[in-house]
Amino acid sequence: VQAVGDIFAAPNGQLVFDAMKLADKGHGVLLLTLNYAGDQLAGKQAMKLAQKAGLNVRQVVTGEEIQFDPNGEDNKRGLAGAVALYHIAAAAAREGKSLDEVAEIAERYAKNMASITVKSTDATHPQNGMSFGDLGETDLMEIGAGQHGEGGGVRVPMKSSKETVATVAEALCRNLELK
């Protein structure tokens, strides 16, 4: 079960808690949360409500975007890696693993994934047309711009897709210490 907020916004804690109640089939609930301020606040509120209601719950936070953690402070944003994480956790649950086992598998995967974004134009809000970012009409691209193009990445001259993939793959492999 997924709890979603308005476009480009996190759901509120009550909505997340309501989704947790729907998901609870007697074996416990794993709350997977992206590492964004709004999602974290909603998750924290929902966890408090769930614990108060006596639900068996665990939480795993995803934060794998390597570009947004320049100081190694473990504040990486959660991105597309969460999709694979949902499937991995669900597969473990379908195999009959306990909530603690599913949470441990999800936590291990979450700590060993990396992603990075690349944008060549600014994103725009579909309802009001507002631009996210100030890349504008340039010959630059931004590596590490976030899932909505919020910015915070590194701007570099536009490259071919082959060169861009090579740059991104090298950064991901270095972050994961792959050879």
Model-identified regions with their sequence ranges:
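General beta-strand structural signal in soluble alpha/beta enzymes
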Residues: 1-9, 31-33, 58-61, 101-105, ...
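Alpha-helix capping and helix-loop boundary segments enriched in small/acidic/polar residues
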Residues: 3-14, 34-38, 72-80, 159
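Catalytic-loop motifs flanking and including active-site residues across diverse enzymes
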Residues: 12, 81-85, 164
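Mixed-charge interfacial surface used for oligomerization/domain docking
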Residues: 68, 93-179
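Solvent-exposed alpha-helices and their adjacent loops that cap or buttress functional pockets
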Residues: 22-25, 50-52, 133-137, 178
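Active-site histidine-anchored catalytic micro-motif
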Residues: 24-26, 38-45, 52-101, 108-115
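Glycine-rich oxoanion-binding loops at beta->alpha junctions
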Residues: 1-26, 170-175
